[in-house]
């Protein structure tokens, strides 16, 4: 297991439910951090799906995506800009040459995620920011700006009450699809307001408090402290990538391995380590064995 190389005070966490089985089915939604964790688990032999609308950062858009799983999308949900058709509710990976193609891809993704959610062994949701972009002509919060000129948007921060309601409602939607599925909430450790760290702190505080309340209100719901591990346990710029915003590869491994160790049976860690060994060998990365 990857360990912190410097002295530290550990963030304590005990998963309050039965450990999740290896080779199970996951459903995940949220930021690039959720995407990274889920893809690593899928590469380790788990089944499942992450982000039916592509990467989403704020709880309002995450809740909206889950609400739309049943009713789906139409060509009217797409708009044309710069020669492509985009959806305000989707990541740019869903942009298409025409609205029919975009709507078809969005609906197929929603259908696949519904199927996955109904049989998932656990659900992971990662919120990253309470800061959102409001599209002024339509007065709506957007999940992605799609490089539309900035003068069409207003930046605002969701209130605590809005964050709380969105996260709790998202959990209730998951519970309706799969009543026994454990829900694991996390706050992404990625700095989402790089130009204003005080705004980033306020944003993360609202998300953290809202996640805590959801865990107290929604059955079978727990919080995994990814944010705290990076900011309070590792708490050093050596654990950030070159952009000083995202966790470094070492930090991601530390957080992921803590997640596996805390929430899963031991075989899940063994599967991950075997997959990581294969990955390093395929890229000809030297294998460094720990000293005895």
Which positions does each model-derived feature cover?
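Extracellular glycan-modifying ectodomains
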Residues: 1-292
